[in-house]
Amino acid sequence: MDVTTQTKLTREEWNSIELPVPTEELSILQFIRQGFHDPTRKENAMKSMYTYLKIDPNPALDHYLCQTFTSIPMKKMTIPLKKADQIRIQSKQVPDTVYEKVLLSLCAKGEFFHVEWMLRLAVSKPNPFVIAYVRECLAKHTPDMVQWTKDAVQLLERNPYVSYKDRELYAHQKELFTVAKEAGSKLILYVAPTGTGKTMSPIGLSEKYHIIFVCAAKHVSMALAKMCLSLQIKVAFALGCKGEEDIKLHYSAAIDYVKNKKTGGIAKVDNTNGAKVEVMISDVQSYLYAMQYMMRFQPKEKILLYWDEPTIAMDVEEHPLHPIINKLWKENVIPNVVLSSATLPAMDYSALTTCTIYKIQNGESNKTIQLVNPNHQLILPHHLPYEEIPKVVAHLEAHGDLLKYVDLGSVVAFLKGRTPFTKASELTIPAIKQYYVTLLATMTREEWEAEQKKRIVVPSTIRFCSEDAWTCSHGPSIYIAEDVQKIASYCLKTAAIPASLLQELTKQLSYNQSLSEKMGQLEKDLEDSNKDSDKEKKMTDNRVSPEVKKIQEELKRLQVSVHTIALPNGYVPNTYDHLLRYGVLDKQAMAFTSDVDASTIEKVLTTDIDASWKVLLMMGIGVFSAEAPPRYMELVKEQVMKQKMYVVLATSDYIYGTNYQFANLYLGKDMRLSQEKLIQTLGRVGRGKQVPYSIRFRDDAFATVLFTPQESPEARIMLRLFS
């Protein structure tokens, strides 16, 4: 089954969206929501002396705090300090992590690049005497821009103070929220790199519009639904619909419903009244029903169609979604539309609409993601054939987002001490890489030939279940291939689990599987037995029929009979025993290992999947496949979301919108991808904090597809379907 198949929500999916997002993510979502009203808003969590002491500034305190908690020479106070203020801060200490003390420490160490960077932060209530003193220190220092450029990896990529950075909207979000407030009908072409909050942007837009969020891949929609519910945004679902009657309201959006007389909760919802719905989650098939439904409660001018990844299924000439997409576009009457993607095709959109067209495209990224070829060499644009370099330059100038796949350290080496920068604020990762592209345009053949002899080789990464496992560092990895079963078999083979141990594991798994099948039948029998009875009343009174009681007792007996199965740590990648086995204990600090809890392993072991997948799960390896049972998929997704899995093996179905954080990606040699789909694939990596990310190509051809202009099947097919 293709994941773009339009289906209703399963019980597991309903349950999964009810789980709240982590606290840090919730804070980001709240900021985006508030940011719609003030796109320029910034905030910084770093404490100043005032915010740490929880007191309000005044001139006397400015002087007193600077004199008391810093070593800055101060003149005698001329403004008397109020007795109440003196008592409030008496005997209190200020830690070295407050803003002013960090600034002074950096000045003392001569780290003036970081001083300049930190002076630009939006820290609340900084001490003016400290700021003035620091600026005086800076004025006496002449920046060495050549050296700072050479040190860019340490200063920018490995900036130890990056955790202090301001929280603000991405540039593309600021522009989107500004354009969305413009009067009149509009088509917004919203293009931004993956992992920069595009799927979160509808949350901000919901402050002005009632949103119909459409995506062909259900797991993308589920991610947004979960975020909305965590913010108490009222949602409804139009998934797998054959009519408006199939639309379902979340309880929070229900107006008319029948209460459970015993519990006081909602027993039955009238799904026809959606007047409270703020965000409608829809698939492509159900959109027109969702549109008509929403228009019964809101004028169409107050509704916005947010179509995420509209080019899904447009990389092939024929697809079951094509006629549905064509009908959607022709019959849509919602005047405000956002087409959101990392890779909207370059084409003339004026032929598709009479609305005002706005194009939002921001490709800047502070991330660096290394590309590695099958020979374990780093890939840079100048490693492509010399004849291709002019095309490469033009392509990179038009698609700045691709520069995040250009290794910063390699670029700095390429510059050989050259720098166009004159002040610290100009020295950024995007600016350095753009300068690299400028130099690339003037590269001679002799220079190109010299660079080919300087290829940087990195450690082998392919045997990631054995001696190379430590290279899967800093977070979970994902391996994308069409034939995931082949990769799964490779994992088991290279893990070198002894045949005797595998035989015993298979025996135990087979035993548990037989119990699982029996329990599955009993659960079905239990459900059937309850169908014709007044279950609600009987369960409340703790009274069940003898037949039901017998089934329940048998279920309990089988559940306790399930064997606990564990794989020795020596075969679980990057555990202490595994690293010791391969003699790489010195890599323990960077190596990432799984941390799947015992209850999840137990649940997976009783799931109806291939025994090899169960062994892989014990190794910390999950499989994303449309063929996998929903229960298994939800269990694995939950562990991936929590950063508990070591590696995920995934088919191309999961290229779009897998909004989990991966540090490394393997791209299988059996993948055949258009440029747009390749960029979507690479976007699975680099969504988290600033750590060393990597993408390991198993075919050299991917670099050419990425860095040179390519014919776009998506553009041709979109033009056909939207006309």
Task: Cite the ranges covered by each PLM segment.
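N-terminal helicase ATP-binding lobe
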Residues: 1-723
